[in-house]
Amino acid sequence: MKSLTSAEIRQMFIDFFKEKSHSVEPSASLVPHEDPTLLWINSGVATLKKYFDGRVIPDNPRIVNAQKSIRTNDIENVGYTARHHTFFEMLGNFSIGDYFKKEAMEWAWEFLTDEKWINFDEALLSVTVHPEDDEAYDIWLNDIGIPKERIIRIEENFWDIGEGPSGPNTEIFYDRGESYGNDPQDPELYPGGENNRYLEVWNLVFSQFNHNPDDTYTPLPKKNIDTGMGLERLTSIIQQVPTNFETDLFMPIIRETERISKRKYGNSEAEDTSFKVIADHIRTVSFAIGDGAMPSNEGRGYVLRRLIRRAIRFAKDLGVNEPFMYQLVPVVGDIMKDFYPEVQKDAGYISNVIKVEEERFHETLNDGLIILASIIEEERKKGSEVFPGEEVFRLYDTYGFPKELTEEYVEQQGFTVNQAGYDKEMNKQRERARNARQKVDSMQVQDTIFTEINVDSTFVGYDQLQKETTIEALVKDKNQIEEANQGDVLYVFLKETPFYAESGGQVADNGWIYSENASAYVSDVQKSPNGDHIHQIEIKEGSFKINQPVHAVVERTFRNHVIKNHTATHLLHQALKDVLGSHVNQAGSLVRPERLRFDFSHFHGVTAEELQQIELKVNEKIWESLPVAIDSKKIDEAKAMGAMALFGEKYGDIVRVVQIGDYSIELCGGCHVINTAEIGLFKIVQETGIGAGTRRIEAVTSKQAYDYLNTKLDLLHNSAQKLKTSEEQLPERIEGLQVELKDSQKQVDSLSAKLSNLEASSILDEVKEISGVPVLAQEVNVKDMNQLRSMMDELKQKLSSGVILLAAENNGKVQLVAGVTKDMLEKNMHAGNIVKQAATVCGGGGGGRPDMAQAGGKDPSKIKEALQSVEQYIVDTVK
């Protein structure tokens, strides 16, 4: 067996199959862009379904790849076992209707045993086959020459991971030797059993069937080969280490974690688990974020958030109590740079995303862990080993603890979670969310009547704003009708329509429908389930009938403003990528005539300087008068051109490609200007965050941008007039006023302090003795809590011995301060307790040190009663 690095093993695998006339398929993004059945790309074959199910014919039926993959169905096992990972690489060779079992098996054996390649000792390899797969058994036995005692028939040898290709499989196992298991009584000590001695190296699937969405199986058009070999596991065998984590794919990460934590890997099993969790999870989140996923509270984002927070929790066991994972990203990039240079290239961006997420969780982590520990302690005192489900929900809802993280933590403490209690609280939250939703009269929820209507309707509004057409159907009160009259509000289907139906963020057109003796206002247009345009109308005059000729007219000014804003969003999208980075992707948009809104992925707020650069880039492209070309292309051709496809959007075989000069190219079904010069002007009015990793820009164009700037100029002009200066000198004038205000404030503070001292001196006469303790309890007139504390300091200096309680009313609220001199502390007087008792009387709360404390209250009418409370406190304390 050769001594090889993981990079050499990966390249050797690809080179071997290139010699066997295979084409190399590049590793696809971890985020599936064309497969809604998958959360992540989870295998080498996942990206090749289109070939296996016959939808697409590859140029070469022989394919080889090294595919990055994510599986998260058993996150809780990662770190505790030798080979569980959330991120891994799958080496695979594939045949689409070309070679089949014999070639696949012989080539696998050649790669593993030939001295030119891996050069395993043949005697250490065993294989498994499906009990009914006699063909595979015979090939192993007679063609390749494996002794029959090393060929095991196993019922589980049928590969099926849900929708997609499936079929019988054969697996190759490597014997690591007796040091990993030698008990002849162990029923699992055989290739394919649950043991650490015989490691599965390679899985060869003979794909003969397609697993359909309805769980039926149909024969594939041609027999195919789908193989998979985990790079991490193969590397552990070749590098002769006990687990995958000791390979060169993980050890540099572990070494860097050692440096950060000042702990050593290999010293304790518990700490080793933490090292493994961190090393695995940083690989996953680095690659996933690099491929466009972002931490959030749902879907893929929730998986990333859970992994980051799980790693942070385990890092605490290594003494790491601050953000650290972001420091590991360059290490991941360096390990993988030969085959995946993009991680190293985007390391800065990936690190920033992770750091922001770490900082966010650290803000609440300690509080959450303290609460976790206290709840466990309380339950133990009760003799319970069940962690309350409602507390699991509270930790998630308040402190951002993923449910799975809490479950894992409490299980380590010997507890189980009350799932029913958690479900009950989650259902309550869902009900609250449902009740909070605004109920609107919209066509977003389609009635069955719209599903039943299937007319021959065509949209012609890309280049026509009015059209002679025919009424195909009328719908009122969920029923088709023959005729509608003045005052009716209903829905109409047209044979041909110039009205754009709301989609892709662009709002629907409005306008009018006319006949010889009737008119109707079109207020909304939506798409029916069958793709036809449904026009919501109100008949202003006359009546309309089925099959009646009509004249449909889009409101031109409305549409003109909309298309300017829509084209501007395309320019903005590209400008964001130029300024902030290629990671920026559209997350939503709204295109209205008066404004545009654009949501995009980014890990922190956009600076004022960046916003200026973005705005300038968009305007420069407007002023360059770039032509806007719109063409229909095949989807593959459009993507080859570099057209941006929006994640989550579904596209047909033919798509509209909107190209703005040589600056922007996107797939888009909306309406646009002919030349960017028509937009005139672009102005950003606001940038905000709308969720973790998602930002929003709102902007105006054309006349609205002109009006917006004029409003700002008017404000500037009026402000200058009021301050009796010119617009150019306004900043200087404001600075001067700020200096004057600061000086005036100092004078006010000085006078207030003097008045406070005078008042302090005047109320010293109000001191009275309670149970031998001098007491001053008084309502005073001050402007804020700072002045109240200053008065307290003054009084404590002047009153050599005693207890003081001061109260003030400001803005309808009660402010309280208590003070105790040093000698009174020895008599157990406590300012914190005094002020807390007084605040309770006023409907508030507070506390503090024994010598000085403050509090607040809600009811000023109770001030007198609150001041009197100190007397009873002293009587009780002196006793």
From Swiss-Prot:
Subcellular location(s) of the protein: Cytoplasm
Superkingdom per UniProt: Bacteria
Keyword presence, Aminoacyl-tRNA synthetase: yes
EC number: 6.1.1.7
Keyword Ligase: yes
Cellular-component GO terms for this entry: cytosol
Keywords recorded for this protein, A-Z: Aminoacyl-tRNA synthetase, ATP-binding, Cytoplasm, Ligase, Metal-binding, Nucleotide-binding, Protein biosynthesis, RNA-binding, tRNA-binding, Zinc
CDD domains (UniProt xref): AlaRS_core
Swiss-Prot/TrEMBL GO biological process terms: alanyl-tRNA aminoacylation
Molecular function (Gene Ontology), one example: ATP binding
Enzyme class: ligase
Family affiliation: Belongs to the class-II aminoacyl-tRNA synthetase family.
PANTHER family named in the record: ALANINE--TRNA LIGASE, CYTOPLASMIC (PTHR11777:SF9), ALANYL-TRNA SYNTHETASE (PTHR11777)
Domain notes from UniProt: Consists of three domains; the N-terminal catalytic domain, the editing domain and the C-terminal C-Ala domain. The editing domain removes incorrectly charged amino acids, while the C-Ala domain, along with tRNA(Ala), serves as a bridge to cooperatively bring together the editing and aminoacylation centers thus stimulating deacylation of misacylated tRNAs.
HAMAP family in alphabetical order: Ala_tRNA_synth_B (MF_00036_B)
Name of the protein in its database record: Alanine--tRNA ligase
Species this protein is from: Oceanobacillus iheyensis (strain DSM 14371 / CIP 107618 / JCM 11309 / KCTC 3954 / HTE831)
